[in-house]
Design a protein with these regions (language model features):
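ATP-binding glycine-rich phosphate-binding loop
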Residues: 22, 27-88
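Hydrophobic residue at the +6 position relative to the catalytic HRD Asp in the kinase catalytic loop
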Residues: 203, 208-213
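Conserved ATP-binding subdomain of kinase catalytic cores across diverse folds
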Residues: 59-163, 191, 195-196
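Short hydrophobic-acidic sequence motifs that mark active-site Asp/Glu residues
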Residues: 91-93, 153, 220-223, 246
Length: 298
């Protein structure tokens, strides 16, 4: 690869910008959720359409929504289940987080739940004008005072697609100019986070929705998995390289070197130092380790 001059002017966020992002996040994190106690169990939650809804009623509605025939599981891992469903007349995405084992449960005695962190970050992004699905509510559940699970509810956004379908190796039929434009806009979307004093710790392409992918005037990336967002910070070089590796590594094990280099080049348009020999070595080594782990899991 050849080193080129930066095409864009990136300036780290000012301290006031970081303070604002941090303040918005902390305010949202302290959302006054209704809480009830019954039979050794505690429920806490909120639903924006009906602020006075009891958490027990919201839990009942969520359980009904995810078991209806028209619901569909989008993603399921050992501890996370993402379901598309209908709730209170809305089409929604319900993301449930289960805690695994006593150590993790004890840890969340001292940390906000993933759902509450998602809620706070999503509220912050929307107030800053950064695209993300509308946060609608969240639930937290404790058993005998110990955290057990939580769930986050966001609006379903019609007409969007998983960004990995357009940027990954499965997008092999996409014209090169489309891939280049998508990569350029993705780099810009991540830089927008940085400029707003926000760092996302997991920027793989499956953590973004893509809106109007073929229309350059309306094309938009929407951020998901916002429990991984850190608000009120200035991302440093290590964090930027990590994001580049996450994007490049998420293209899939069959992506070509040219496709990965395209991602690096679009980021380097904002951060020319990414083309330095040492930075490139870090990126390639880190990406290779990531891909090796994926192959072992297959």
């Amino acid at each position: 690869m050849e080193t080129g001059r930066s095409q864009n002017d990136y300036q780290p966020p000012a301290r006031e910008t970081c303070r604002r992002a941090r303040a918005l996040y902390r305010t949202a994190l302290q959302t006054a959720a209704l809480k009830i106690h019954t039979d050794g169990k505690t429920l806490s939650g909120c639903w924006t359409d009906r602020p006075d809804m009891a958490p027990s009623e919201l839990l009942m509605l969520v359980r009904e929504a995810v078991t209806r025939p028209d619901s569909r599981i989008i993603k399921q891992t050992g501890r996370i289940t993402v379901t598309r469903a209908h709730l209170e007349g809305r089409e929604v995405i319900i993301k449930r987080y289960d805690l695994d084992g006593p150590l993790e449960r004890i840890r969340y005695l001292f940390h906000p739940s993933r759902a509450r962190r998602f809620w706070a970050a999503a509220s912050t992004l929307r107030k800053l004008g950064i695209p993300t699905p509308q946060p609608l509510g969240f639930l937290e559940r404790w058993e005998r005072g110990i955290p057990a699970s939580s769930c986050m509810i966001t609006a379903f956004v019609p007409g969007t697609d998983d960004a990995s379908h357009w940027l990954g190796w499965t997008s092999g039929t996409r014209p090169d100019d489309i891939k280049r434009a998508l990569a350029k806009d993705l780099a810009r979307a991540i830089v927008t986070l940085y400029r707003s004093g926000i760092y996302h710790r997991d920027t793989k392409t499956s953590n973004l929705l893509l809106e109007h992918p073929l229309d350059p005037e309306r094309r938009n990336y929407l951020w998901l998995d916002l429990e991984c967002a850190v608000c009120g910070v200035r991302p440093g070089r290590h964090q930027i390289i990590r994001n580049v590796v996450q994007v490049a590594g998420s293209l899939g094990k069959e992506a070509t070197c040219a496709e990965r280099e395209l991602i690096i080049r679009e980021f380097a348009a904002w951060f020319p130092w990414l083309m330095d020999r040492q930075a490139l070595r870090h990126i390639h080594c880190w990406t290779d380790r990531r891909m090796h782990k994926e192959r072992r899991c297959c």
